[in-house]
Amino acid sequence: FPSKAFSLDNDANAATLGEKYFGAGKALGNFCVFTLGTGVGGGCIFGGRLQRGRNGNFFEVGHVPVGLTMDLSARRCGCGNMGCLETLSSATGITASYIEFSGKQRTAAEIAGEARAGDAAAVKAYAIAGQALGLAAATITQLMNLTDFIFTGGVAAAETWLRPELERTYRAHTFALFHNAQFIFTQGDEDAGILGAAALFLE
């Protein structure tokens, strides 16, 4: 299609633009998005624009090293590094934590059901995921003075079990003036990425 203009971007950046123009980000200025699914992705609106950085690799939040500080086995990420956020806070990471705590094989959907039923290993797996998210968010705040965070994707539906440790850990690792940070969980917003892809032409 030599006569047609097109744009190409990753799903996390598209979801971030979807939130900026059509979702929770409409009411915010500068904010970060964590996409929580099979992996962990992210995007950042700063100065009113989606930031891309050198080579388009700005805000690869899924690969912030947080796992080496946790009281459980360090895991190798698909990127090749150890202890990435993705190894703890993605559906894959939560499943690995559950197996480590319980010794049982379960799917991510089954673990969510176990958490709803009060299963201790499932609740702990989500708590660890929330703790890791809190560490990552605190790092971003201390580096960039950003305090508005949107969490989207399938894992974000587990807000009930993620939020307590996320907030506790965030406050433990940030200055008091940042303790009014917003943590917004969007659920069922499956069109954010599609709408954001369309919004690439608005940037």
Could you tell me what each predicted segment is?
Residues 1-14:
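N-terminal glycine/serine-rich phosphate-binding loop of ATP-dependent small-molecule kinases
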Residues 10-12, 20, 61, 87:
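Generic detector of well-ordered alpha-helical packing
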Residues 13, 49, 156:
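Short, glycine/serine-rich, charged loops/turns that create anion-binding
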Residues 11, 37, 197:
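Active-site glycine-centered loops adjacent to acidic/histidine catalytic or metal-binding residues
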Residues 26-88:
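Glycine-rich phosphate-binding loop of actin/hexokinase-like ATP-binding domains
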